[in-house]
């Protein structure tokens, strides 16, 4: 038998040739993990060593999950969908994609979930692409100062707490104080801008409902549809029945849809209703993922949860198209406690707050805006000049009225100046009352506020202020061009003021002898006792 001779060089050469000529074809590397445990909307997955933070994972039954915790031994995954079909031992596959939502004009008039899927049974949505949920907010050099007004149609807000395009204005108050009503009114007030067809005026609206009752969301949608506002509005719905993961993601989904329009040079108004429930959902997710709790059991990064969301609202520079996204986040307080953890966080992030008082609401002062602690830090620069001119003393007059009210409760005699403050204040408070879902055009607001702050209503009975206001606005529309002048120039000229005074005199003349009460010379009446003060508007904390 011949001896076998092995030449190492030949073996090495043969192996090298084989390796060089090997063609794997279409074989691809696939990582497969398995569910090690699953409970309460959270799944722990083992065996995916290369997974990215916030990557989408697909479970065996087709449900998607979001990788939030990347631990040494396993991955904490938030299930985005039906949790019931996920069991221990099921396979989990990587998708290689981070969470994103479809975007585009097709979303106007639709109701969608936080993943962008339609919920209104109106068929598929035509999209222009996708946008990631976790994107950096515009930088300092990408922004421009807020200088364009965004009218809400609410006299108390547009006069004293003005909002500009690109601003973040918090709406805060106890439950059932009219927070959602203010946000919906702001959406309804954009209808005339939308119908104008002018891209510079049009405002696309997004209403993000987090943790609300499904019936409440349906009622908001019906209100928008009945008032012709649904055609320029998108509703992102994560009702109370949804999982904590979807409620946590809903505001980011709405923001991504709005950012697509903002970077396209358009103007957007987005309402987050409400961020308290988003924070609670994020707390639930974090505790289930075994993240260490902090104050009120919220995780340590709960401030970042809201700051990275609200910082996406901006007024972009001219180089980026000059688009804007205005944010109206809503926060619910407990017993008017604005010093709680989440309220103080969001107050520090936003550019101002509109504080709604339950005592004012119960006293029939609606909208129940507490002008004493409500503020707009940047909106004043965007206020219409005519409104700024007529509302300059409004906040001061109301503050004097509030302080004098408390004094009048115990005083048996008041001097003429004090009686005048009470007279003016009562009528201003009545003037600021406004029915729900009836936003006022800015020109109407200017005329109404002018009548109140210049004392034109001082001799009108408090009970008839609303009727007098309607009659005055009708008279001004019919007999003058003041409204057109305000709309075109944004100013209230001297000749317009003279025309308004003439209109007031004519309306008062019509009121004489009718059922409406005119109280000529109120300031000359004898002293008013405590019983003469309108007690229902007194709020003493």
Swiss-Prot record:
Domain of life assignment: Bacteria
Record field: compositional bias (Polar residues): 532-541
Keyword Disulfide bond: no
CDD domains, per database record: ATP-synt_F1_alpha_C, ATP-synt_F1_alpha_N, F1-ATPase_alpha_CD
Catalytic activity, as annotated: ATP + H2O + 4 H(+)(in) = ADP + phosphate + 5 H(+)(out)
Example of a GO cellular component annotation carried by this entry: proton-transporting ATP synthase complex
Enzyme Commission code(s) on record: 7.1.2.2
Membrane disposition: Peripheral membrane protein
Subcellular location: Cell membrane
UniProt-annotated binding residues for ATP: 173-180
Stretches for region Disordered: 517-541
Keyword field: ATP synthesis, ATP-binding, Cell membrane, CF(1), Hydrogen ion transport, Ion transport, Membrane, Nucleotide-binding, Translocase, Transport
Main location: membrane
Bias (Basic and acidic residues): 517-527
Pfam families xref list: ATP-synt_ab, ATP-synt_ab_C, ATP-synt_ab_N
Residues annotated as site: Required for activity: 374
Record text on subunit structure and interactions: F-type ATPases have 2 components, CF(1) - the catalytic core - and CF(0) - the membrane proton channel. CF(1) has five subunits: alpha(3), beta(3), gamma(1), delta(1), epsilon(1). CF(0) has three main subunits: a(1), b(2) and c(9-12). The alpha and beta chains form an alternating ring which encloses part of the gamma chain. CF(1) is attached to CF(0) by a central stalk formed by the gamma and epsilon chains, while a peripheral stalk is formed by the delta and b chains.
Family membership: Belongs to the ATPase alpha/beta chains family.
Entry protein name: ATP synthase subunit alpha
Organism: Kocuria rhizophila (strain ATCC 9341 / DSM 348 / NBRC 103217 / DC2201)
